[in-house]
């Protein structure tokens, strides 16, 4: 693949669908040890290709393969140009929509970002399209702007368009099934109206995992 190496990315701009082909790509050394990419026992992005994208606006953007490939994909985004240094990923995702990926991150108009797209499996490769578009986040997507709730009862939530923030992603108590990440998270501040033990649950009436 011509953009198999991070030193020779395909330059793209704007929003929409951008084709990719990893069928002849190899697994480079760069972008392979990112904490944000760790899922299901590995942080590797196999058989990866690279893109250099300039944001047209200051917004939260999604870079995703949902609905546009059969590849079990993995995507990582790095700020700036050139081959990324270790620990520089600002967003990474393996399975957001089935086996496909979606990374949401804050972009600044005129700034350039390096996108790494590959496979979860060492033997995975394929073709498809990468979709880039701005999204409107829920008001409590950021921990700085939580929904304020109090007392007991049922409180509605909707994380359909929520992004995965950096905060609260490496908690030892959250580690399960190979990851401690809380994907597509939203935030609440709750004031208790009682003294004693309480329980927070989504056990009834929800289909989200």
Which residues fall in each region the model found?
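Acidic, Ser/Thr/Pro-rich low-complexity intrinsically disordered segments
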Residues: 8, 13-14, 24-138, 145, ...
């Amino acid at each position: 693949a011509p953009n198999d190496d991070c030193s020779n990315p395909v330059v793209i701009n704007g929003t929409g669908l951008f084709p990719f082909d990893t069928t002849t790509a190899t697994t480079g050394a760069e972008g392979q040890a990112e904490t944000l990419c760790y899922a299901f026992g590995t942080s590797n992005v196999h058989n990866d290709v690279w893109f250099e994208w300039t944001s047209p606006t200051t917004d939260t953007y999604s870079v995703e393969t949902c609905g546009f490939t059969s590849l079990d994909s993995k995507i990582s985004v790095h700020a700036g140009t050139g081959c990324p240094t270790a620990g520089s990923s600002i967003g990474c995702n393996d399975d957001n929509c089935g086996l496909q990926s979606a990374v949401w991150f804050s972009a600044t108009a005129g700034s350039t970002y390096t996108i790494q797209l590959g496979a979860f499996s060492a033997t995975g490769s394929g073709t498809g399209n990468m979709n880039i578009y701005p999204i409107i986040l829920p008001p409590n997507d950021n921990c700085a702007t939580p929904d304020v709730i109090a007392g007991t009862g049922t409180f509605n939530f909707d994380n359909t368009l929520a992004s995965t923030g950096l905060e609260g992603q490496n908690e030892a108590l959250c580690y399960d099934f190979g990851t401690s990440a809380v994907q597509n998270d939203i935030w609440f501040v709750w004031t208790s109206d009682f003294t004693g033990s309480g329980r927070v649950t989504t056990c009834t009436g929800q289909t989200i995992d």
